[in-house]
Amino acid sequence: MIVRDHKDAEASAVDEDKFISRRYTLRADGMGHSVHETYIKPGQALHMWYKNHKESVICIEGEGQIEDLTEGGSWELKPGVLYALDKHQKHILSSEKGMTVLCVFTPSLVGPEDHDAEGSYPLYDDDGSLIKH
């Protein structure tokens, strides 16, 4: 059994300019997915495209908006609202006052990934070698 708390996740956190991602489970845990708690900093709009991963996201605190740039549409996010990027949609995630979301990635992240110029995470092998950018 894996049991981790917020302090454990802080040790593997990635702090980018627009958000902080605390990673609770990663590839080495063998779960087939990774679980992250991500805080979107106030006034941010993140342009993303997870071309190598699928992601499910549920808002747990604050409010924001998700805009689907691939299929169209925009939705308000508040605690309890989930969205899933089932077709690798390009999207913009934004929040005026800050928002915390719980994210599940498949395949799981290795750990140190951060977004590239396209807003995507590269795909790494178990040993940390790059498979696909």
Q: Where are the language model's segments positioned?
A:
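Ligand-binding loop in jelly-roll beta-barrel domains
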Residues: 65, 87-114
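Short acidic-glycine-tyrosine-enriched beta hairpin
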Residues: 71-88
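Conserved hydrophobic/aromatic positions in well-ordered beta-strands
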Residues: 36-38, 57, 102
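A short, N-terminal "cap"/entry segment at the start of jelly-roll beta-barrel domains
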Residues: 1-33, 118-133
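Conserved short histidine dyad/triad with adjacent acidic residue
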Residues: 34-51
